């Protein structure tokens, strides 16, 4: 049997070509895809992390102290949920001081009615959904220690700052129970994200902040009942796939803030934007950061 010169050349060519391919790396593992570009946000500060691993995914002035607006109420809830022997079904009687506070400060309200009896659990809904400063006041009055309302409120704010210290939130300080501060109510995107991540460990908090709307039955002064309806100010719920919370904030100095979280395919990203330029832009900023976070987490 003859092996022609052409056959030998063809065989040699195949060997040479295969060697060249291997040498060129064509058959080796493909290179990693290019990293997605970091998003541009209108907010002056932003931070995102993988909630499971704690890995930082995005920063923009993440450690610059800024006014927090009603995102302060995450700490209000955290202090309540951290109370020993907490009874979420214990009742609180709504005081006139709470409604007077709303009127005096033109503050966001859960529309609590003087004389009604509401549970601590219901106050948490009133705190986190409509961002009720009256609910925040009621909780501070309930869980602060002291013989006067002023003393109890001062003590509760002290508990907020102690909790911040215990959570190693080095750039955070509170001088109010609701975010209507006196110049010393501040935090950072990183610190607020860490606070939210810690507070999300409480199942009650997780349930509350993912709720779009609720109707709560409360006891009236006369012993009857009425229903209180509250809707969540967080526009991410129902508009961003996997959104699970957590809290909006706004104010003259704070502008527009949002602490946010979402879960997709078993992975949760959580973050904060502070001092955005509008309610719409803070939501857009958050969506951009979560989209990016899920790509790089």
Question: Each predicted region: which residue ranges?
Answer:
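Active-site-adjacent loops and short helices of periplasmic peptidoglycan-processing enzymes
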Residues: 32-190
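Hydrophobic alpha-helical segments, especially transmembrane helices
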Residues: 10-11, 74, 264, 268
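Short alpha-helical segments used as structural interaction elements across diverse proteins
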Residues: 6-7, 70, 279
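Secretory targeting and sorting signals
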Residues: 1-33
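Penicillin-recognizing serine hydrolase domain
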Residues: 34-45, 144-297
